[in-house]
Amino acid sequence: MSQKSPVNDWFFKGYEAANGVYPVQAAYRMSQAILGLKAAVEKAMAKNGGKKPSTDELVAAMTGLEWQSPGGLIQMKLADGHQAIQPIAFSRTKYNPDLKRVDLVDIQYFAAECVNPPPGVKALDWIKGGMQGAKCN
């Protein structure tokens, strides 16, 4: 359900070839976590001269980090750079009798800044306040 991108195309095709089914949400979340850890390790090692990073170095590298994933751009923007936001999609399901599977139809995509509160604002307060500052396309 993620938007078309080179990273998503690579992931979707590889996953489908290896498993015989298309990837679902859990596979996307795991790839996102692994790619985030990879980005943090690379950032920490670039800063410390190429050594294996410590936990503190990884935490510092992950703070405010952004990276591309099959599900879109992940941004550590909330909670002082310790909570991720990302784009999201909603859809309906429809049975496909030819392929004997359920397909996603009528997919709508929303930017991360459209469905997450601005930094420093609690989600419930943001919703009650009419989602002020939401950046929707």
Annotated model-derived regions:
Residues 1-137:
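Extracytosolic ligand-binding ectodomains
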